[in-house]
Swiss-Prot record:
<comment type="similarity">
    <text>Belongs to the PNP/MTAP phosphorylase family. MTAP subfamily.</text>
</comment>
<dbReference type="InterPro" id="IPR000845">
    <property type="entry name" value="Nucleoside_phosphorylase_d"/>
</dbReference>
<feature type="binding site">
    <location>
        <begin position="52"/>
        <end position="53"/>
    </location>
    <ligand>
        <name>phosphate</name>
    </ligand>
</feature>
<dbReference type="Pfam" id="PF01048">
    <property type="entry name" value="PNP_UDP_1"/>
</dbReference>
<protein>
    <recommendedName>
        <fullName>Probable S-methyl-5'-thioinosine phosphorylase</fullName>
        <ecNumber>2.4.2.44</ecNumber>
    </recommendedName>
</protein>
<feature type="site" description="Important for substrate specificity">
    <location>
        <position position="221"/>
    </location>
</feature>
<dbReference type="GO" id="GO:0017061">
    <property type="term" value="F:S-methyl-5-thioadenosine phosphorylase activity"/>
</dbReference>
<feature type="binding site">
    <location>
        <position position="185"/>
    </location>
    <ligand>
        <name>substrate</name>
    </ligand>
</feature>
<feature type="binding site">
    <location>
        <position position="186"/>
    </location>
    <ligand>
        <name>phosphate</name>
    </ligand>
</feature>
<dbReference type="GO" id="GO:0019509">
    <property type="term" value="P:L-methionine salvage from methylthioadenosine"/>
</dbReference>
<dbReference type="GO" id="GO:0006166">
    <property type="term" value="P:purine ribonucleoside salvage"/>
</dbReference>
<comment type="subunit">
    <text>Homotrimer.</text>
</comment>
<keyword id="KW-0660">Purine salvage</keyword>
<feature type="site" description="Important for substrate specificity">
    <location>
        <position position="167"/>
    </location>
</feature>
<dbReference type="InterPro" id="IPR035994">
    <property type="entry name" value="Nucleoside_phosphorylase_sf"/>
</dbReference>
<feature type="binding site">
    <location>
        <begin position="209"/>
        <end position="211"/>
    </location>
    <ligand>
        <name>substrate</name>
    </ligand>
</feature>
<comment type="pathway">
    <text>Purine metabolism; purine nucleoside salvage.</text>
</comment>
C-alpha cells in the first residue's frame, strides 16, 4: 500500500481529523524542515502531514526549506505526496473557490535551493521533468473532486513566482501569454525535488483570489483568508476521499 504524505499550504497548517500517533522532529543534510512530520490515521489509513509554512504559519514562500521538507518526508518513508496550494486565478474559469489539478508548470522563481544534485557529486544527474506531476495521482484527485461536487478544472498550468508579494498586472499579462492558468509561490522547487527523490507528486490548488488585473477590486488578505476558510472543508474532504479510495 502506497505511503502518502500531505503537504499543507496556506490555510492548512493542521490536518483536522488526523489521529496523530507520532510527531517526528527530522534532521536533514539540508537543515531543518518546516516542522515536525506528523504521522497518524486519516480516512482509514496511515498518512504523514507536514505544514509547508510551519505551524503557526511563519515561513514566507521564498524562505521555505523545500529541500529539507522533501528529504525528511522521503526519509520518513513517504512514497507519494499530495501538495495543497493556495493560488490566484488567471484563466477566466479559475474564479475564487475553484479547484485546479494542474498538469504542468512554469517556474519563475530565483535564488531558491532547487536541487539535491549540487554538492559532492560523483556524477551529474539530469531528471526527466517533461511532465512534473504524477498522472496517477492527478486522476485520483480529479475523481475525488468530482465525487465531492466541487467546481474544478482537471488540467492547468501553474505559474510559480518568487513572492512574497503578489504580482503586478503586467506580470500576470506575461504569465497569461506564457500559457499559465493559475499563479502561486510554492509549487517550485517542491515538485522538482520530489521527482529527484523518485516520489510521486501532485498538486491540489484552490483559487483564493483573482490574479492582478483580473478584477477591478484590490486584492486583500481578508478576501484571501475568507476564501481559505470557505474552501478548506472541501480540500480535506477531497484528500480523505483520495486516501480512502487508494
Amino acid at each position: 500500500m502506497t505511503v502518502y504524505a500531505i503537504i499543507g499550504g496556506t490555510g492548512l497548517t493542521q490536518l483536522e481529523g488526523l489521529n496523530i500517533r507520532q510527531s517526528l522532529p527530522m534532521n536533514t543534510p539540508y537543515g531543518a524542515p518546516s516542522g515536525e512530520i506528523q504521522i497518524g490515521d486519516y480516512a482509514g489509513r496511515e498518512v504523514m502531514f507536514l505544514a509547508r509554512h510551519g505551524h503557526p504559519h511563519r515561513l514566507p514562500p521564498h524562505q521555505v526549506n523545500y529541500r529539507a521538507n522533501i528529504w525528511a518526508l522521503k526519509q520518513a518513508g513517504a512514497e507519494a505526496i499530495l501538495a495543497v496550494n493556495a493560488v490566484g486565478g488567471i484563466h477566466p474559469a479559475m474564479g475564487t473557490g475553484h479547484f485546479c489539478v494542474p498538469h504542468d508548470l512554469v517556474d519563475y522563481t530565483s535564488g531558491r535551493q532547487h536541487t539535491f544534485f549540487a554538492d559532492d557529486l560523483e556524477e551529474v544527474t539530469h531528471i526527466d521533468f517533461s511532465y512534473p506531476y504524477s498522472e496517477a495521482l492527478r486522476v485520483r484527485l480529479v475523481a475525488a473532486l468530482a465525487a465531492e461536487g466541487c467546481a474544478f478544472s482537471d488540467r492547468g498550468v501553474y505559474a510559480c513566482t518568487q513572492g512574497p508579494r503578489l504580482e503586478t498586472v503586467a506580470e500576470i499579462i506575461r504569465l497569461e501569454r506564457d500559457g499559465c492558468d493559475i499563479v502561486g509561490m510554492t509549487g517550485m522547487p517542491e515538485a522538482a525535488l520530489a521527482r529527484e527523490l523518485e516520489l510521486e507528486y501532485a498538486c491540489l490548488a484552490l483559487v483564493v483570489n483573482p490574479a492582478a488585473g483580473k478584477s477591478t477590486a484590490v486584492i486583500t488578505m481578508a478576501e484571501i483568508e475568507q476564501a481559505l476558510r470557505d474552501g478548506m472543508g472541501k480540500v480535506k474532504a477531497t484528500l480523505a476521499r483520495v486516501l480512502s479510495a487508494s
